[in-house]
Amino acid sequence: MKPTSRGQVTLKDANPVHAPNIEFNYNATDQDQRVMRQGIDLARELIASQSFSGLTGKELKPGAGDLDAFVRNRGESAYHPSGTCRMGSDPGAVTDLEGRVNGVEGLRVVDASLMPEITNGNLNAVVIMMAEKISAGMTP
């Protein structure tokens, strides 16, 4: 729920029509690998329990020895990537605390990309709250 790996989004070129370069960099840290391994181990334990007997076949992938490589190569987010335009006052932030993109006059970002860290729950309520707060401070 709280990955420590960090990816990046960079511009391919100055043409706004061209898609950006997106590097998710999933499971790049030892901590993320460990958490994924623990989750898969728990799922395996549950599926091996009496409650599931007769409902499952033998495990096909990844096999006990290949778990880390499987997680590194196949693990990804189900949905809700966020944090690509981090909000903050530090030099690495993309926007200020009002969602204004640093160095681009007149452009604001108000979505889940502002979150420096993902929340434990659904992002919808947090994004609505950010949008309400930022829009309340805007003047027409």
Task: Indicate where each model-derived feature is located.
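FAD-dependent oxidoreductase catalytic-site/capping-region signature
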Residues: M1-V126, I134-P140
